Amino acid sequence: GIPIILFSGPRIEIKPYIKFSGIFKILKSIYNVFKNKKAMPYIIGYGGHTYELFGYRSWTFACVVFLSSTYNVYLSNIFIANFLAIIGLTGIFSSIIGAQYCIGKNRPLIISYMGLICFFGSIITAFSFWINLYLALLFIFIYNILIIMDSGSLTTGTVLNGSSQDRGSRLALHSIIGFLGGALGGPIVCLLYTSPSPRDP
């Protein structure tokens, strides 16, 4: 809230006070969002996006430690912490650049291309683990950029596809489904890590 107060200018959007009209009207508004065939693909896509992102974030630290042990190369805690911090920082710029690139273009097509590139990026990243530690770290970094590139574009697509009257409901559903995907991503990756291998006795 503090950045909004500091940087939004002297006047924030002012709307007339509307009396609370009951939970059923809110549910109806959310139901109407489900029927919005233009906005829902972006909302569902955001759920898939956060599923992949939070799954990625949950295994990155353990993955770097594992790679360090596998290649018998010592990586200090400070190096790993700074590496992860840089990953998080560059993700912000990746999302902004991706959103800016979609302006005035065929947004669904571009987001589809972004997802396809990210898919191939994940495969290349996995193969890099067998080649070299530092090459693997490089592709982990690149893969992060590819994951987050469509984040702002998906949110913008949700905002643009609908009327101003139900914008709040669209964004609420966007966040709920998005973070539901994020809540599932980490535990599922953890389950895959801890599940017994076929080679285990």
Predicted regions and their residues:
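A late C-terminal transmembrane helix in Major Facilitator Superfamily
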Residues: D166-L191
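Juxtamembrane intracellular "pre-TM" segments in multi-pass secondary transporters
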Residues: E13-I43
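Paired intracellular helix-loop junctions of major facilitator superfamily
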Residues: T158-R167
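Helix-to-loop junctions at the C-terminal end of transmembrane segments
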Residues: S95-N106
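C-terminal transmembrane helical hairpin of 12-TM major facilitator-type secondary transporters
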Residues: L109-S153
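Single conserved hydrophobic/aromatic residue that forms the stacking wall/gate
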Residues: Y193-P201
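Extracytoplasmic gate region of multi-pass secondary transporters
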Residues: P41-L84
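C-terminal membrane-cytosol helix-exit motif in multi-pass small-molecule transporters
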Residues: G1-P16
